[in-house]
Amino acid sequence: MSAPAISYSEDSALSVLLDQEFAPERLAELCPESALDARHWQAALYEPLRGFLARPGKEFRASLVRLGYRIAGGTEELPLALPELVEILHAGSLIIDDIEDDSSSRRGAAALHRQIGLPKALNAGNWLYFWPSRLLQQLSLPATAELSFHRAMNQMLLNCHYGQALDLGATLGEVGRAELEPAVRTLSTLKTGSLMGFAAESGALFAGASPSVVRTLNRFGQELGVGLQMLDDLGGIQSERRAQKGHEDLLNGRLTWVWAWLAEAVDATEFDLLSQMQTQVQARDLHPEVLCAKIRPVLKKHRVRVHLHLDKAFGELTSAVGLAPGVGELRRTLSVLEKSYD
């Protein structure tokens, strides 16, 4: 059973924002001295992104923005663009991620670079990193608040790229058994947790929360991100439906929670055997499913580890802010989301 997904319809917030950005009068501002045909931008940028953003998604990060806002005391309706900023940034990271991994699919369709070619997909993914800055400007925030947003967003983007560099630059054979857990935790916090932390803190920033509340929500979001990465890594091994993801991780020798947990769960002899099989998988001398079958029994109860991690994150949040509105609803949403990793 998969978690319910949100399909970005013609009237979705992302569609509305994208249509506004590519309105004829807006495109005319880019080239005021000539009647350059808007079809060039539409074909290379608008149409591919309209299709990509229309693919089903869960909008969990947007929910985190709303939660942060409510915890910080916000009562008015949020501007249309604010919760979508993180979804836009996330969409950009997915496009770039798929290019770097040469993934074949994303959200039920071909990866964007497989659809429109690498150059256009690369430009589209990068454009999604910068569009939120323009949307922030359009919110007409007080100068100090806008500066805080930009600083938080820039730090998040920097951390995400540090995490991606570690994901691309370090493989299993290069990290010792004792260093696996801290390396995987660092990677997960930077690459996945940073965006979730920004989502949680951005709502609080908009509500004018104190620095301590902003820091608490950022930390909470980071830990949620780490928990979701745990689910993602484990699901790639345990779920038949998500086997392609698990196989891809093994073929690329990625640092995942699977290997961090294996380093704790088995003795040195067994770990060496699994590592040798991993080397064969990376060399394409062994099918990754053979290694998956060897790993599954060892990690069959490790979903409990994920639950303990998430329970701790929610417990720390409650200790800091009390039984704030929206926390229970987010927990229920997360329970449904968890099923998408099965």
Residue ranges and their predicted role:
Residues 249-252, 307-310, 327-332:
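Amphipathic alpha-helical protein-interaction segments enriched in hydrophobic
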Residues 14, 21, 25, 30, ...:
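Amphipathic alpha-helices that form helix-helix packing interfaces
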Residues 321-342:
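Short, amphipathic C-terminal "tail helix"
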Residues 1-35:
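N-terminal amphipathic/basic leader segments beginning at the initiator methionine
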Residues 17, 48, 294, 298, ...:
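Charge-rich, solvent-exposed alpha-helical interaction surfaces
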Residues 39-271:
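Mg2+-dependent prenyl diphosphate-binding active-site environment of isoprenoid biosynthetic enzymes
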Residues 273-318:
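Mobile late-domain/C-terminal helix-loop "cap" segments
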